[in-house]
A protein has these predicted regions:
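Active-site-proximal substrate-binding groove within the catalytic cores of carbohydrate-active enzymes
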Residues: 1-155
Length: 156
């Protein structure tokens, strides 16, 4: 019996190999409960993956299509929604995942090698951790303050 998945693979390979941890996470923006998949993607550090006409699509599962101009227009909106969400954390794709901490039943923190932290809140209510407010069913990305470099110090 599984109580909770932990991103072991991502802790080893994130920053080296792109990943989508579960088949159910393809075309997530087309799913009715996309918020849950979107949060899992943020927690596991994966990028969105979209496929047209996948043979693995089961009847009755939501999917994206491009058979008509209307379907294409709708699917482009779905893909754009996923890309916009990923833009919030896309800079982390080249950094190693250093830590994954379960802070509570519905709150997790993923820490990256550049010091960035992603707080994911699966709860229906806002939560706070480490002084970071995370809205209900959302995530927050906290990036470290930029450190001065030798070249920036010379410019002063």
């Amino acid at each position: 019996m599984i109580d909770r998945y932990v991103p072991f693979w991502q802790l080893v390979y994130h920053g080296i190999v792109l990943s989508t941890p579960f088949r159910t996470m393809w075309n997530i923006e087309a799913k009715p409960d996309k918020w849950r998949y979107r949060l899992c993607a943020a927690e596991y550090g994966n990028r969105p993956t979209f496929y047209y006409y996948g043979r693995w699509n089961r009847p009755g599962e939501p999917d994206i299509h491009c058979g008509t101009p209307e379907e294409l227009a709708e699917s482009v909106c779905v893909i754009k929604e996923g890309a916009d969400d990923y833009a919030r954390r896309s800079d982390l794709q080249y950094h190693f995942m250093d830590r994954h901490d379960i802070l509570g039943k519905d709150l997790v923190r993923t820490t990256y090698s550049n010091g960035a932290r992603v707080y994911v809140n699966y709860a229906d209510v806002p939560q706070t951790a480490d002084g970071v407010a995370v809205p209900a069913r959302d995530y927050a990305v906290v990036r470290p303050a930029p450190q001065p470099t030798a070249s920036s110090a010379r410019r002063r």
